[in-house]
Amino acid sequence: MKNLKNIIVVILLACLLAGCANDQYSIEKNYWKAKKSADSIFNNPHASPPFELERAVKLLDAFSKKYHENDLSVDAQFKIASLYLVKKQYDKGRARLGQIIDVYSDSKLVSSEALFLVGKSYELEDKWGLALNHYKRIIKEYPLTKKGFDVPLYIAQYYKIKYQPDKMNAAYREAAVHYKTLAGKHEDSLIGFSVYNLVARCYMALKEWDKSIDSFNIIIDKYKGKVNLDSIYLNTALIYKNELKNKSGARGMIEKLIEEYPQSKLTNTATDLLKEIDKK
């Protein structure tokens, strides 16, 4: 009798899970239908008539309200905001993004993504000052989100694209200082590892090779035995070899990589690099 009860429980649980799976499938199917109109606008925003935008917004709004507890609900709201942006209705796009930030204020991830799009909307209008203000808000308010990690480098790369080398270099230096501070607060976690890598990237962009090496050495000292360092060893070796013309430094890093990570996908590359160094 006990076994029979257990079997019944298992069957009921399986049915419940199947029902949940079917519900999610149904929601995803409905979302696919709701965003078809939006996708056609994204593919050709200049040719789509106003009524098509209104229809797409209406469908996505209806979906979002009906399934407000589902993760796809917020995705639908982002789709609406993005529709307004590609149609160059920037005020409406920003208004929708503001609503997203208000409704999902507890989610730093969602808020940071919405705030980035607000900044991007100003950038699309060629209002860089306003865009920059929003990007800096992300750095200050949401430093540990993906956008929080990305934005300092994004700002520097903007100046690079605009051929403003002085501002680009200043932005990379500002980013390096920010990342160092952030890494210091989280050096006992993998966040620190990731952010020290960003510090190194800043100095590499600035061609300050010694500082790049210093950043990689900090990573090696602090995270050896905690994470794989094969790519760190290889990047350091390449800087020694190609930029600093330091064969012994390059050889030392390559030998560490081969010794500590014999099964690494980078080992063959490292071995070839070592042969190249020894030829010269």
What is each of the regions a protein language model found here?
Residues 4, 19-280:
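Acidic, polar-rich low-complexity tracts and alpha-helical solenoid repeat scaffolds
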Residues 9-16:
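Bacterial N-terminal signal peptides
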